[in-house]
Regions:
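Active-site-adjacent core segments of small-molecule enzymes
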Residues: 2-574, 578-581, 585-586, 590, ...
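Short amphipathic alpha-helix with an adjacent loop that forms part of the alpha/beta core around
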Residues: 615-622
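A charged, well-structured terminal subsegment
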Residues: 678-712
Length: 712
């Protein structure tokens, strides 16, 4: 049995998709009607130089199809990458939920996961500073469940009514369609400065979470509070978390800008190549479970999507693992046409009254009609459930099935009463019977008003190097705004989060922090709402810090899939290279020779070695660490190329590990920083073990002050 067929047996969804695959290998070219084509290079003409004839149906079909190949891109999350995989449960959660996916540990539930940026268009860079979408489609035996989340646990806004305003503000400005995939402009900060509920998510975006090293190295969150329902009908509130086994790691802003120029498909390529090489990305699924009786015990509202529950208050219980082990066969058919709907749930999972979630339940289904062209988008192969589907919903554009029988209604006798309804005991879905005693009102709960405490908690929880990155991000973003009044309002709001943060940003901008701003502070209120209503109170300090919020507390135990650039030319020391390469690859790192030219280079033992990257076509920002084997001829050749010196200096600037052996240390000295050899992540004739440990730490952020002086 081939590796591919063995894999497919583990994944019911992939088996289903294979029935829709088309493979033209060894087949003749035909029209859409099956007519074999003799010439697809020339149109039908009245003579070789004559007019093209209208009767040329081959030309018309080919051009007609080309004219209609594209579909509208997603309004948000247009830029995406996806993969197939499976989810396995560690232990039964039947105490909390009757969902089969949370009870049966023998199942391998097929999943399709799409990662995305929010603001940019389909062709924008992967490395924009932005929230990342993290949407998981579970093809369960009880129906499809979509957990449509992000890589940040909180959202910008509290109510879906504000979503069009948010997106209109962050998208390119309508008068000139500038800037693309960027929040650093006036309309966005005009909105944020007047809508203070945005401040928590915004500081997450300003942190390193906004520019992840890899899609495989970021967390995922369900954002909303959902309900779990067990067999007895008892409910618990739940927040969903995805924890990457490789840890949570990011790049610097300088790297992100340069990666966007060197390889704007960096994240997409990284995900594809990792899966293609058998280094399958993994996340563990965790739950924060809260009894219904504890709904109001916190200093924040569980229904507020701009708030998180600190893990110190409610620990995350790890319940299972997701593995992505197969790339899509076709980007358009799968990644582009997949439709995620928060309204896709299964028995044992239910909604809450989160006002953002409630609006998403409508919006995600509604948008598919214009994007995919029909309400029958569930018949597109990637969207089809693996369970049998039988109902009385009929017809419409692009109906792909042929329903049998006379009846399309219920109740009926002519169809034997089928398809029949199912009792709850036999697996039918029923909504949770929540008691409701309220007046119909268009208003915001006062329990949603605290807009400063959690962003302050987030900032306090960061390490010093993370705080420096936040300061730089705010300084860059606000520095791009042209309206000083907007910037000053933002500075005042930041001062309510942390005065030290605001002071540093204001100094970088050359502006004073205003002592007061125009009231109401939060202007996202109704016309007849009292100006004092829905205003943020002064921040509370109900928790000094939360370790889970800082990337300095993530996993640092692996160099798997890390990209190591080996700088070498003719005459490089084979012994140095071979020894280090063997140790690195044993830990599943990827070592690539970067040389002054393509083709091959010859080592000091007169053996040829293929070059993986020509220095003219690559950059240091595409690698995690640098290896410089000895060999005087090799080092002299490298130092003749200014770009190799730049490569090493830039790797140092971005706080990466660099190992040099023998004469390779001469390139280290080109960094031209005092005591550079005393750096913990600069290894001169060090051991492979020491180099591996330095790479596993991701970066040596202790060198940031010195690194800032490096000009590259």
């Amino acid at each position: 049995m081939s590796k591919k067929s063995k894999k497919s047996k583990e994944n019911q969804k992939v088996d289903q998709l294979e029935t829709s695959h088309k493979d033209g290998a060894g087949q003749p070219l035909t029209t859409r009607q099956g007519l074999k084509v003799n010439d697809t290079n020339n149109s039908l003409k009245a003579g070789p130089r004559g007019a093209t004839l209208l009767e040329d149906f081959l030309l018309r079909e080919k051009i007609h199809n080309f004219d209609h190949e594209r579909i509208p891109e997603r309004i948000v999350h247009a830029r995406g990458s996806a993969a197939h995989g499976y989810f396995e449960l560690y232990e039964s959660m039947g105490k909390y939920s009757k969902a089969g996916i949370f009870n049966d540990t023998s199942r391998k539930t097929p999943v399709f996961v799409r990662f995305s940026t929010v603001a940019g268009s389909k062709g924008s860079t992967d490395l924009a500073r932005d929230v990342r979408g993290f949407a998981v489609k579970f093809y369960t035996e009880e129906g499809t469940w979509d957990l449509v989340g992000n890589n940040m646990p909180v959202f910008f806004i509290q109510d879906a009514m504000k979503f069009p305003d948010l997106i209109h503000s962050v998208k390119p400005e309508p008068n000139n369609e500038i800037p693309q995939a960027a929040s650093a402009h006036d309309t966005f900060y005009d909105f944020v400065s007047l809508t203070t509920e945005t401040l928590h998510n915004h500081i997450w975006v300003m942190s390193d979470r906004g520019i992840p090293r890899s899609l495989r190295m970021m967390e995922g969150f369900g954002i909303h509070t959902f309900r779990l329902i067990n067999e007895k009908g008892k409910a618990h509130f739940v927040k969903f978390h995805w924890k990457p086994t490789l840890g949570v790691h990011s790049v610097t802003w300088d790297e992100a800008v340069k990666i966007s120029g060197a390889d704007c498909d960096f994240h997409r390529r990284d995900l594809w190549e990792a899966i293609d090489s058998g280094q399958f990305p993994e996340w563990e699924l965790g739950m924060q479970i809260i009894p219904e009786k504890d709904e109001h015990k916190f200093d924040f509202d569980l229904l507020d999507p701009t708030k998180l529950i600190p893990e110190e208050m409610v620990p995350v219980k790890i319940i299972g693992k997701m593995v992505l082990n197969r790339n899509p066969e076709n980007f358009f058919a799968e990644t582009e046409q997949v439709a995620f709907l928060p309204g896709n749930i299964v028995p044992g999972i239910d909604f809450t009254n989160d006002p953002l979630l409630q609006g998403r339940l409508f919006s995600y289904r509604d948008t598919q009609l214009s994007r995919l062209g029909s309400h029958n988008f569930h018949l597109i192969p990637i969207n089809k459930p693996v369970t049998d589907v039988h109902n009385n919903q009929r017809d419409g554009h692009m109906q792909m099935e042929i329903p049998k029988g006379r009846t399309a209604y219920f109740p009926n006798t002519l169809g034997g009463g089928c398809p029949h309804m199912t009792s709850v005991d036999d697996g039918a879905f029923t909504s949770y019977q929540e008691k409701i005693d309220a007046k119909k009102i268009r208003a915001r709960s006062d329990s949603f008003n605290d807009h400063f405490s959690q962003p302050a908690l987030f900032y306090r929880s960061l390490s010093e190097w993370e705080k420096e990155h936040v300061i730089s991000a705010y300084s860059f973003e606000l520095g791009k705004c042209k309206e000083q009044s907007i910037v000053e309002r933002m500075l005042w709001l930041i001062s309510q989060i942390d005065k030290g943060l605001a002071k540093r940003v204001s100094e970088n901008l050359g502006l004073d922090i205003p002592s007061k701003i125009e009231k109401p502070i939060n202007q996202a209120i109704g016309a007849d709402t009292k100006p004092s209503k829905n205003q943020p109170p002064k921040k509370k300090n109900y928790l000094e810090s939360s370790s889970a919020l800082s990337q300095s507390n993530t996993v640092f135990d692996s160099i798997a899939t890390r990209q190591i650039a080996c700088l070498a030319s003719d005459g490089f020391n084979m012994s140095d290279f071979k020894k280090m390469k063997k140790a690195l690859e044993k830990e599943n790192a990827i070592v690539k020779i970067v040389a002054p030219h393509g083709g091959t280079i010859i080592c000091d033992e007169d053996m040829e070695h293929p070059v993986d990257a020509n220095i003219a076509t690559t950059e240091s920002v595409l690698f995690d660490a640098v290896l410089i084997p000895g060999g005087q001829n090799s080092i002299e050749a490298l130092m003749e190329h200014a770009k190799f010196t730049k490569f090493v200096r830039e790797a140092y600037k971005h706080c990466k590990a660099i190992a040099a052996m023998g004469e390779g240390s001469q390139l280290i000295d080109k960094i031209e920083v005092d005591a550079v050899r005393e750096d913990d992540a600069i290894l001169i004739d060090g051991t492979a073990k020491d180099f591996i440990n330095a790479i596993a730490k991701h970066r040596n952020w202790n060198r940031m002050e010195k690194a800032a002086k490096i000009a590259v």
